[in-house]
Amino acid sequence: MVPSATRASRALWVGAEYSNIHAGFPYQSNQHLWGIGGFADYHLSPHIAVEADARFLRFNSFYGETEDNYLAGPRYLTRYFGKFQPYAQCLAGFGAIQYPFQIGSGRYFALAPGGGASYRISHRLALRGEYEYQLWLNSPNIVGEPAHMITPYGFHVGVAYKVFR
């Protein structure tokens, strides 16, 4: 018999979230994009999970700018502190941008380290909040713009539902 403290706790959580992101373009702007997204977390053990996210930042745009991203990667979960469970993650994938004033669009490889916490409401329901800093490599690659990569960052808040354990 395997002790419960070491028993694998495979579970699938799915959810939706609201994002408020400091836009990475134009460089050094104070523009924030808002949007919605979805995620899925598959817990392999009590402390290791794999996450996949899709976010669509389409609101409060700067002259038509939008940013979307599709990311996946590992997530490390700490022990519970009451109903809170902090976590750290490092996701990778791609970010897509429609530049302002319809000057073009681009897709870039993105790295996204971040962290947050989930708050268990019930056995199957949790709230979560996280901070993420994205690095869009080889961007923006536009003539006349500084050679600084696009680095959107900000907060996500959402709700998750445990599909199965």
Predicted regions and their residues:
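Extracellular loop and loop/strand-boundary signature of outer-membrane beta-barrel proteins
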Residues: 23-26, 58-62, 98-103, 140-147
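Short, surface-exposed loop/turn motifs at beta-strand boundaries within globular domains
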Residues: 7-9, 31-33, 43
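Surface-exposed strand-loop-strand hairpins of Gram-negative outer-membrane beta-barrel proteins
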Residues: 19-39, 53, 106
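Gram-negative (and chloroplast) outer-membrane scaffold detector with strong preference
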Residues: 39-112, 119-121, 152-165
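Outer-membrane beta-barrel biogenesis signature
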Residues: 1-16, 79, 83, 163-165
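Generic short beta-strand segments
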Residues: 18-22, 55-57, 92-93, 132-135
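Predominantly the C-terminal beta-signal and adjacent terminal strand-loop region
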Residues: 119-165
